[in-house]
Every structure is written in C-alpha cells, then in structure tokens.
Swiss-Prot record:
Organism: Synechocystis sp. (strain PCC 6714)
In-chain residues carrying the UniProt-annotated modification N4-methylasparagine: N71
Protein name, entry field: Allophycocyanin alpha chain
PANTHER family tied to this protein: ALLOPHYCOCYANIN ALPHA CHAIN, PHYCOBILISOME 32.1 KDA LINKER POLYPEPTIDE, PHYCOCYANIN-ASSOCIATED, ROD 2-RELATED
GO terms (BP aspect): photosynthesis
PTM section of the record: Contains one covalently linked phycocyanobilin chromophore.
Amino acid sequence: MSIVTKSIVNADAEARYLSPGELDRIKAFVTGGAARLRIAETLTGSRETIVKQAGDRLFQKRPDIVSPGGNAYGEEMTATCLRDMDYYLRLVTYGVVSGDVTPIEEIGLVGVREMYRSLGTPIEAVAQSVREMKEVASGLMSSDDAAEASAYFDFVIGAMS
C-alpha cells in the first residue's frame, strides 16, 4: 500500500482530513516519483545484465552451489537459480515504484525461508545472490538512485537472513 493510500485510509478511519504531516509525506512521495520510475526503468531495462553478472559473481564466490551435489549444479538447476534471482529483482522494482516494501513482502517473501529450507537450498546463497544483484545494479545508477534502490534490496536480503 502506498503512502498515499495509507494516509487516506488512516484519515478516513478517524473521519478527519489529512494532517499536515501526512500531506508532507505525500508531497515527498510524489516529488520522488520521477526518481523511483527512473530506477525501475534502469532495473527493468538492465535485468538480463544484472542477473547474468550477479549470477557469475555468485558462482565464483560460492562454487559449492554449482559443483556436483550443489543446488545450482547442471544447466537446468543453474537456469532455475537465475530465474529466482530475476524474480527477486522484479520484486525490488515493485518496491521502488511503490516507495514501500509491502508489495515485496506480500507478493514474494512470505514463507521464503521455509520454502528454500524444504528444498535444501542454502538460504545464505539466495541472500548472497540478491547482494550481488544490488552491487551490479548500483553500478548502473547514480549514487542517489543506488542508495534509494539499496533499501529495497536490503529488505529482501534481511528477509532471508
């Protein structure tokens, strides 16, 4: 739920107008809209590069997962790992656009640790893959945009820790 919707729902529940503080938060949200869209466009337009480079970095740092017996061993399992990375990158873009972590949490993080545990997938490797995407993506943006996007990557990483 965006800051706009949250503010309206809260004010309406109390049968009142929006407060000056709520209006200020909405103004900041609207003012930052162009930056959030620019970040989302960068992430979306560069998704293949981000996932590929981050995957390469992950596999160099964690050769155990692409070695025989590893969860990303073999072409099919490596593709599955990269698919999952792409999914988390997409969730980050949802958070960036909405200016809120709620879509990330509600769409894709509920039960994620339990799911990976049941599959025998090392959750720390999944978290590392998101860290690698954050690093690659940050290199494609201005420092301000990278700082904004980092909060959403960090939220995903934190949910896996």
